[in-house]
């Protein structure tokens, strides 16, 4: 792995009750973690648990949001704005997750607005991109990634990209138990850097954190993180178990 910081982020989706959130942080807070300044970790609970997670956290665990609305002070029933998140100390936000794209029909144009607004307000979007199984089998991975990056980052000043994090999540590997091989993940993320270099600069492309997401577990995380272009992981199921999450954080 290169010399950049390592990011381990857990996406809890719509799992965990209030009691389960308390139990998770009870275990995490009582664990003496290796204090490595180059490892950044956090979890993304549902909106109603963000305040609770912030109150319970005692081990430098970031609290992330799973989405954000890019408008403020408007009549948008059922959403939470970026400013409201920032107001409670949440600065990292997952944007464009494949489940948001598919289940909520989020377009690249909408995702672009969200990413742009977060960056302009000094927040850190975690932009998720990736291909479906059909696209993967048709050898369209590169075309899909290029198209998503061009649309999702359209009109965003390059100077703002220093706060962007990208998560490559092949849709066919999310929640399926299938994991892209470390080489497949490396190749895709290396290509993402190539496209970023064309859209911004080689310096930005080389310094921007890019994570892998898709059935990451304590058993495969070290091999994935050993790849030169992979700077961390966006983890689903394995992040729900505090003991497994700790293993992910402490992985060598």
From Swiss-Prot:
Substrate binds at residues 11-13, 175, 215, 236-237. Its EC number is 5.3.1.1. It holds the Pfam family TIM. One of its GO terms (molecular function) is triose-phosphate isomerase activity. Pathway: Carbohydrate biosynthesis; gluconeogenesis; Carbohydrate degradation; glycolysis; D-glyceraldehyde 3-phosphate from glycerone phosphate: step 1/1. Gene3D superfamilies: Aldolase class I. SUPFAM superfamilies: Triosephosphate isomerase (TIM). It is found in: Cytoplasm. Keywords: Cytoplasm, Gluconeogenesis, Glycolysis, Isomerase. It comes from the Bacteria. GO terms for biological process: gluconeogenesis; glyceraldehyde-3-phosphate biosynthetic process; glycerol catabolic process; glycolytic process. One of its GO terms (cellular component) is cytosol. The active site is at 97 (electrophile), 169 (proton acceptor). InterPro entries: Aldolase_TIM, TIM_sf, TrioseP_Isoase_bac/euk, Triosephosphate_isomerase, Triosephosphate_isomerase_AS. It catalyses: D-glyceraldehyde 3-phosphate = dihydroxyacetone phosphate. Its main location: cytoplasm. Homodimer. Belongs to the triosephosphate isomerase family. Involved in the gluconeogenesis. Catalyzes stereospecifically the conversion of dihydroxyacetone phosphate (DHAP) to D-glyceraldehyde-3-phosphate (G3P). This is Triosephosphate isomerase. It comes from Mycoplasmoides gallisepticum (strain R(low / passage 15 / clone 2)) (Mycoplasma gallisepticum). The lineage of its organism: Bacteria, Bacillati, Mycoplasmatota, Mycoplasmoidales, Mycoplasmoidaceae.
């Amino acid at each position: 792995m290169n010399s950049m910081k390592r990011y381990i982020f857990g996406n809890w989706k719509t799992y965990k009750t209030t009691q389960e959130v308390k139990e998770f942080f009870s275990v995490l807070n009582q664990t003496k973690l290796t204090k490595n300044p180059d490892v950044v970790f956090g979890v993304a609970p549902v909106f109603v648990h963000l305040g609770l997670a912030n109150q319970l956290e005692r081990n430098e665990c970031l609290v992330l949001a799973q989405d954000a609305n890019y408008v403020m002070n408007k009549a948008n029933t059922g959403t939470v704005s970026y400013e409201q998140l920032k107001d409670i100390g949440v600065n990292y936000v997952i944007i464009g997750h494949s489940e948001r794209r598919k289940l909520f029909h989020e377009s690249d144009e909408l995702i672009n607005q969200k990413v742009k607004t977060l960056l302009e307000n000094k927040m850190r979007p975690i932009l998720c991109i990736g291909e479906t199984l059909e696209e993967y089998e048709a050898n369209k991975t590169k075309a899909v990634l290029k198209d998503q990056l061009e649309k999702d980052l359209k009109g965003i000043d390059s100077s703002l990209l220093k706060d962007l994090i990208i998560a490559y999540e092949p849709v066919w590997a999310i929640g399926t138990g299938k994991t892209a091989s470390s080489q497949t993940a490396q190749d895709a993320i290396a290509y993402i850097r190539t496209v970023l270099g064309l859209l911004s600069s080689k310096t930005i492309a080389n310094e921007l954190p890019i994570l892998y997401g898709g059935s990451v577990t304590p058993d495969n995380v070290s091999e994935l993180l050993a790849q030169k272009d992979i700077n961390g992981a966006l983890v689903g199921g394995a992040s729900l178990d505090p003991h497994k999450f700790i293993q992910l954080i402490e992985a060598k």
